[in-house]
């Protein structure tokens, strides 16, 4: 019997072939499905690892599996393959909506041990782990790109006070969907929809060069500056009001992601682990 929040039989059948074999050279793995369900329990509840129910096995095993598969890229590969499968049957809608959301970081997320060479100093991050410090405390910003159905295509993490517009092109550059057969990976959406925070002339120009339709309203100050120049201000950029209404899919995706309490508040010390947790949640959304 499948417990609440655990992998369904259908979801397990989809990802099982993408996991390392349970038995092989070296020590035998603990059952993958049990361990993944343990990680999902942690994401759903936001509880400490040591509170993991006994039915999921030792908490150290689940924690180590999360660490190991984060390091070797297993979670990212699973998400990529799930998206490839949907795209091969035409289910991925290449109308991309982007937005960001700030999450409060728990005090325990700070103080990750530094290993190796000193981390580069940044005015936007604390210890280089995607943590920003402000009067409200520590925070991380999630920059998200979703397809036309509101399913996550790409996530970028920054410190909480980082701007939105500088992350738009990195978000799009990270979208590469391999073909299920011959052909180059698809990386260019048909349309990108974003709010006023992304309305910048350089952004519009960059997307125009890529042949991407950009739907974003002008900011009030941009309208005023253009009006002040009179005829030299040029024409306003095209704006499709009906298409812009579809932008709410990215807000709904954030709502679904934050149903996982471990994501609604960041507890992970390492930004790589928080990114992995977001990737796992994205896999769950794609498999629903």
Question: Where does each model-flagged region fall?
Answer:
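Short alpha-helical elements
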Residues: 1-288
């Amino acid at each position: 019997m499948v417990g609440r929040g655990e992998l369904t039989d259908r979801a397990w059948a989809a990802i099982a072939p993408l996991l390392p074999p349970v038995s092989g050279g070296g020590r035998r793995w603990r059952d993958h499905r049990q361990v993944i369900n343990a990680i999902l329990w942690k994401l759903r509840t936001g509880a400490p690892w040591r509170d993991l129910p006994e039915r999921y096995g030792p908490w150290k095993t689940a924690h180590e599996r999360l660490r190991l598969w984060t390091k070797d890229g297993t979670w990212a590969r699973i998400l990529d393959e799930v998206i490839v499968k949907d795209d091969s049957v035409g289910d991925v809608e290449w109308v991309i909506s982007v937005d960001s959301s700030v999450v409060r970081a728990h005090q325990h997320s700070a103080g990750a041990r530094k290993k190796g060479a000193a981390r580069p100093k940044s005015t936007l991050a604390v210890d280089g782990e995607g943590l920003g410090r402000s009067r409200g405390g520590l925070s991380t910003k999630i920059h998200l790109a979703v397809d036309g159905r509101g399913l996550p295509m790409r996530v970028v993490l920054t410190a909480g006070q980082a701007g939105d517009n500088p992350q738009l092109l990195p978000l799009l550059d990270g979208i590469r969907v391999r073909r299920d057969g011959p052909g180059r990976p698809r990386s260019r959406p048909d349309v990108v929809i974003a709010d006023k925070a992304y309305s910048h002339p350089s952004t519009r120009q960059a997307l125009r060069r890529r042949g991407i339709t950009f739907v974003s309203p002008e900011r009030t100050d941009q309208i005023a500056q253009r009006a002040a120049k009179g005829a030299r201000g040029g024409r306003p950029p095209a704006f499709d009001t009906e298409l812009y209404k579809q932008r709410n899919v990215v807000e709904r995706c954030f709502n679904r992601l934050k149903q996982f309490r471990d994501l609604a508040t960041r507890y992970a010390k390492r930004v790589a682990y928080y990114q992995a947790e977001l990737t796992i949640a994205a896999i769950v959304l794609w498999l629903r």
